[in-house]
Amino acid sequence: MFFGRDDKKEAQKRGLTVPLLPLRDIIVFPHMVVPLFVGREKSIAALKDAMAHKGPDDKAVILLAAQKKAKTNDPTPDDIFHFGTLGHVIQLLPLPDGTVKVLVEGVRRAKVKKFHPNDAFFMVEVEEVEEQTEKTVELEALVRSVHSVFEAFVKLNKRIPPEMLMQVASIDDPARLADTIVAHLSLKLNDKQALLETESPAKRLEKLYELMQGEIEILQVEKKIRTRVKKQMEKTQKEYYLNEQMQAIQKELGERDEFKNEIQEIEEKLKNKRMSKEATLKVKKELKKLRMMSPMSAEATVVRNYIDWIISLPWYDETQDRLDVTEAETVLNEDHYGLKKPKERILEYLAVQQLVKKLKGPVLCFVGPPGVGKTSLARSIARATGRKFVRLSLGGVRDEAEIRGHRRTYIGAMPGKLIQSLKKAGSNNPVFLLDEIDKMSTDFRGDPSAALLEVLDPEQNHTFNDHYLDLDYDLSKVMFICTANTMHNIPGPLQDRMEVIRIAGYTEPEKLSIARRYLIPKEQEANGLSDLKVDISDPALRTIIHRYTRESGVRSLEREIGGVFRKIARDVLKNGKRDIDVDRKMAMKFLGTPRYRYGMAEAEDQVGIVTGLAWTELGGEILTTEATIMPGKGKLIITGKLGEVMQESAQAAMSYVRSRAERFGIDRKVFENYDIHVHLPEGAIPKDGPSAGVTICTALVSALTRVLIRRDVAMTGEITLRGRVLPIGGLKEKTLAAHRAGIKTVLIPKANKKDLKDIPLKIRKQLRIVPVEFVDDVLREALVLEKPEEFGRKPTTDGGKLGGTTELPASPAVAPA
């Protein structure tokens, strides 16, 4: 019997009339015991009525239903959910303030069928909801799943006691399991009401399963957040604790005082240092930040380094120029022999500086082969002008940051090499040597040559901005001197900012003078022979120059002289100290087998072999060109690792020769029945340029006419299809190379006649230099002809024809052997 009735089903049909207790923010489920505090008069009256009309089992029955809105103080039937829980009033305790504390137990779900009129409290007729008790395999699986999820939920939710897990594990009834679990979940009121109104235990468990899964996900995120926050708090607390300890230790050791002293020292330096206004403000700002930092923090170290760099730079510190032009000239001549042009330019600068007082530093570029004294001349210029000297090697530099520095945001950032060098010099007007400017390259880190555009521009470099300093620095007083072996690798805009001064190779008399004045005393001292009298004769020096070196400069000559002195040093230790005279034979004995042959490029006059002249970054060179013919189908073969321009020159020369075949006495059938091969020896070395045009043309004419070429003639020049000889570059270097090789006659383009003044007078007197305007002029000078004046002037059929053999035919055009 339920609530004292004889038949439960009959009671459900008839309905049950009970008082209703509206609840705020709480829903009571069956099997749930809840304490409630009741203060509203209607609610207290409902409880008193339930206690006054107990059933036969002596239990007070009341319907526990939730309000839709908790804020409603005087709810109407529409403000209350019409689905609640029938419960027993276990205990009722009036309180002194007029409220009532009541303990209720939920028993069964019930629906409100009807509200009875009653002003004192709500009296309702309810219909009990029967729980489904049939068990299935699916329901059993659902029960187990809910048990498992609830276990995971309890482990994450610290608000539910672990004992609750054991209590729930003992419940097998699906309906009771769902009601027991939901009572301990922190769900929204509407979610709990929905579960209360779900009559099917299976659906209730499914819904509960979904809700718990969602709660578990939220709890897992909360756990991660709590763990992260806890770790952060522990770290912060640890750092705080350690910092406090550190400060205490520093206080004991006096380090904090040392940090304060360091800041005071920086402030003192700032007062005494002349800097730009921008730099002064920047240092003050950084100093303010430094005071707020811990002395041991990484950021404090970065700020300290930055301030040190700014203060240590020579913003207005400069050396006074030695403006005495005569004294400066004496210093330059003491250090270097020759080099007239660069010396004149420096003396001109000093003269103008003496008159104008304020003059921007020049930007010079010394271009010449290795060993001619470009770098040492820059050092000598610094000595002559009384300035500090700094050198920056640009060979292999491919990172823009090497010039402009790294931004301070990077770890280990530093200023660029320019600023570092100026700090090292301690002066804002040094002689700054940018060595090997043609050896820079470019990659993904930027183009250093583009960064130098601002540095070497007198109109811009007074506001040079280094990335690290982020301040404008004045470079306009610096005398920049660049060095390069060739101009080809220097970008055009950068060339435009420099005053190029070409330094050609040394002549033999100049090398002799340099050896006597500088190299011999230097090597004698370097090898510990200063107290001995060692005399190296001129023939010995000439032998070293001719047979052991072949260069434009004197670097190899210095090495060979050093080798002679090392042999002498060994001989002195072995045989005792004595004065030594080194003659030609002794020099050759000391240095071993000669490396080079001096004299004519060729031992005798030959067919198809011409001595040409080339200009490389190492200076002037002798370039032999060979041509020969063989039976074939008229192909032109070109070998010797030639560049595209030189190959085109060979093709142009061939076209010119074919166009004048009759005048040269060449049978046209030769071009159909013979292949022509042009080769430039030393095939491993790349060669390019148009200036070998006349050389190739002469070799072709000689090979096709079987006329010998004079071995004492060298030539250079570009040719056109009309036979004109065009001007070339590097005439001085090429002429010096011819002189070194013992050549007697040099053929040059007539348009280069104006450049002869650059060639030393002694060399011009020792050479026969012939300006030529047409290829015919070249051939008349180079070929061994009986009547040179008539060659090529009119068609001829005499001699020179080939009849299927490459042997030299007897011909009136060929000089007798």
Swiss-Prot record:
GO biological process: cellular response to heat; protein quality control for misfolded or incompletely synthesized proteins
PROSITE patterns from the UniProt entry: LON_N (PS51787), LON_PROTEOLYTIC (PS51786), LON_SER (PS01046)
GO cellular component: cytoplasm
Cellular location(s): Cytoplasm
Entry keyword annotation includes Signal: no
Region (Disordered): 789-817
Ranges of residues in domain Lon N-terminal: 18-216
Active-site residues, as the UniProt record annotates them: 691, 734
Annotated family: Belongs to the peptidase S16 family.
The protein's name: Lon protease 1
Gene (name only): lon1
